[in-house]
Amino acid sequence: MRKERPGVLFNKIRSYFICPGCNCLPDWPVTLPCGGTVCRKCFRNAYSSESSGKVSPSRCCFYNHKKPHYSVETEVKDVIISKVVELIKTTEFQISQQSLVPLELKEEICHDDCLSSSPPCTSALTEITLLPPTFHNLIPSSSSYETAVAEFLHMEDLLQENVSRELECQICFGMLYDPVVSPCGHTFCGPCLMQALTQSPQCPTCRFGLPSPVVLEHAKSHSITTFLRDFYPDNWLERQKSWEEEKEQESWLPLFISMLAYPRMPTFLHIFELRYHIMIKKCLETSKRFCIAMPLRARSDGHNEHRELRNARGQRLFCSEYGTILEIIQVEPLIDGRSLVEARGSYCVRIIDFRADGLFPRVKIEKHYDTPLRATPLQFPEPEYLLMYGNLSNEELVERIDAFYMNARRTYVHWVVPLIDIKMEARQSIADLSYKITNLLPISELEKTRILQVDNPTDRLVLVLIWLTQLQESWWYRVGSACTIA
């Protein structure tokens, strides 16, 4: 049996999940964008405007953070913490149902115990003071004291076991590491969720649309993190070490200089060179991932708009600075020695270093996630056009792009129209719409690499509209007008 006094473990577990505003277990826990958790009542008091009753993100939270939470808009229940709170309350109720007697009998019980104990009653009184606040008015009867204490300790151990079982990631089914709370209230390991978002921008549990990983990285649950670090430090350090090794391994990937690929879109490759056969084989043995980038080609005037990459060792790499991580789905060997590789884009990357010593180059990458921040004109590939279209909303941009293609379908240039429904694709994923349109645009592939540099979905739509405008201006007739031949 544990040597710890009854009530200590219960109070310790309970302390991790209480609301800092009212110092009580939250009936409806709300996790803030900073990772702190409060009850719904305290949330409304802190973030609601007194005049309108609407949520106002102008105040800071109870965790003494200096910056206000500009993204606080809803009071979605934190699913995992609500389950943990329910377990704590259930255990609290079960303990209260033990055969206990009122505090008024304390002196009588202590007197009976003192007849055969020395020193008199000291340990019993100390244990009583350490019981949870709910039980301070109760004391075990002297006849069944040891049994009551044993039951109490067993319930505490069972509570810890049940809480740890709830704190499991629904992606890797392991204990949570670096837990991130999604806007829909579900919690996952940070690395697992970031990995899942490369396949689909939806919650793995409820399919709710999720924001950019850059936003989610800040929503790490403070309560769950501190609980797991304190109760399971060895497991936490093991997961941390494993993730750092995996991250270091992922940061250096084989590079295939071939073509342009896009995130969350299928890509098919014909592999016939021996060195790339070896590269694909090595990828299949490890993470099944590699980086693909567009090769540089000189323009007709002999100059190159994109300069080659150089590293500290003086080596040069003739490819674009931005590429895409492809994940191999399957490899089909053909009878003529080639291999047909089916892959899918995961996310955009920026090449920050490379090694060109072996059969194929290996590159160190930096993930290029979407952000909610809009680009400034100086950061945008076409600054003068950004000033023209930069103030348009997503809906207005989609309307203009759709109008262009609707007009094109009625002319002799219907062949430039992508075989997709613009508005339907926008409803499904506004972040991927620009990639799907760019993939089918009749412009230079090297020019298309600009889309990988833009990390805001709205700015990407602006860039697509710029390309459509330039494309229309370069034609010898206007879309929507009659074709005349002199």
From Swiss-Prot:
Residues 250-472 form the Lon N-terminal domain. One of its GO terms (cellular component) is cytosol. GO terms for molecular function: ubiquitin protein ligase activity; zinc ion binding. Keywords: Metal-binding, Zinc, Zinc-finger. Gene3D superfamilies: LON domain-like, Zinc/RING finger domain, C3HC4 (zinc finger). A zinc finger (RING-type) spans 169-207. This is LON peptidase N-terminal domain and RING finger protein C14F5.10c.
